[in-house]
Design a protein with these regions (language model features):
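N-terminal cap/recognition module
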Residues: 1-5
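Acidic carboxylate diad motif detector
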Residues: 6-116
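Positively charged, helix-rich recognition surfaces that bind polyanionic ligands
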Residues: 101-104, 116-337
Length: 337
């Protein structure tokens, strides 16, 4: 059964025979269709062995999202302080001036309303004119991503690991305490003690807000790092195709690897490069950037992960990550993202 046939069955057979499910019709019709399409895509990817079995989404347990699309000129109208959403009507925006308004001639094609940690967000697809001109005349750079430092650039700039900062460590300790408190409330509730359900929901919201705050700090750091790199206007940027899935199998490194958000960095860097007319090169994951001497091109096969300084028989001595960044910059075998 395809997503289209499921939608026909839902409207013509299931809802008429189940009056208690009539609330589905109260929702914006395109939002229901989009949910069915997403479910169809998820199952298709599962049967093609491209992803795991789809997770069941439920209000209160998952991040709820609502999709809307512009069917006529009166839909999806945006002003500086408010946005008109089909079915919901006018909704005030807390952060004013971020979305291009209809008065300025911009057209909103579609959007998504989502909720995270008791906060509502809207993201919109807007058609904008492409007026930017590429002026990337500087030398290309290579970026080596790692765990000790988040990113080492071949121009000498190093971006520290934000997860080692005192602020994030404090928040992670606070998160552990709140998670333990939530677990105790669930245990007491199962034993039939006097812990109220409302208190569990309050504690759950505390945990969600801490998760969201930590995630926002990491995402903000990635955005600022990419913006600073792109401002140097290199002619090209070379990164390595990291085997993150393989790195996650190491139980000693999995948490540190996940918190670095390497894939998000790559996706956002690719979008920024496309926006500014830069070429993003991706070196093969088997390219020995860390083990190759930048001076004589000799490969040290005995180099260990604990060796932070690269020493070659030719006398070349350099920081391991900086040496890898230089090799990535000069890599001749790559794919353009």
């Amino acid at each position: 059964m395809t997503g289209k046939s499921f939608s026909v069955w839902l409207n013509n057979e299931y809802i008429p025979n189940n009056p208690d499910k009539a609330w589905i019709k109260e929702v914006y019709s395109k939002a229901v269709k989009r949910s069915i399409e997403d479910g169809c895509t998820a199952f298709t990817r599962f049967f093609k062995h491209q992803s795991d079995f789809p997770k069941f989404k439920k209000k209160g347990k998952s991040d709820v999202k609502m999709y809307f699309v512009r069917n006529n000129p009166k839909d999806c109208v945006c002003e500086r302080h408010r946005l008109k959403i089909p079915t919901l009507g006018w909704v005030r925006i807390k952060e004013k001036g971020y979305i291009p308004t209809t008065k300025d001639g911009y057209v909103i094609k579609s959007g998504t309303v989502s909720i995270k940690a008791d906060r509502y967000y809207v993201s919109v697809l807007v058609e904008l004119p492409d007026n930017k001109t590429a002026d990337n005349s500087n030398e290309g750079i290579g970026i080596d991503l790692g765990l000790k430092d988040f990113a080492t650039v071949s121009n000498g700039k190093t971006y520290k690991n934000i997860n080692k900062s005192a602020k994030l460590k404090k928040l992670e300790k606070q998160l552990i305490r709140e998670q333990r408190s939530l677990s105790r409330k669930y245990e007491n509730s199962q034993k039939g003690e006097s812990t109220q359900r409302a208190n569990i929901q309050k504690q759950k919201l505390k945990v969600q807000k801490l998760h969201h705050r930590i995630d926002n700090i990491r995402t903000d750091y990635i955005n600022k790092t990419i913006a600073e790199i792109v401002k140097t206007k290199p002619s090209y940027i070379t990164i390595e195709d990291l085997n993150v899935k393989g790195m996650m199998k190491n139980r000693h490194l999995s948490k540190a690897v996940a918190s670095q958000k390497f894939y998000e960095f790559r996706i956002k860097l690719q979008a920024k490069c496309n926006e500014n007319g830069m070429e993003l090169r991706v070196a093969n994951r088997w390219y020995p950037s860390s083990k190759t001497c930048h001076c004589c091109k000799n490969i040290r096969k005995d180099l260990k992960l604990s060796d932070r300084i690269f020493k070659c028989a030719c006398g070349y001595i350099e920081d391991r990550d900086f040496n890898a960044a230089l090799n990535l910059r000069d890599a001749m075998t790559y794919e353009v993202a």
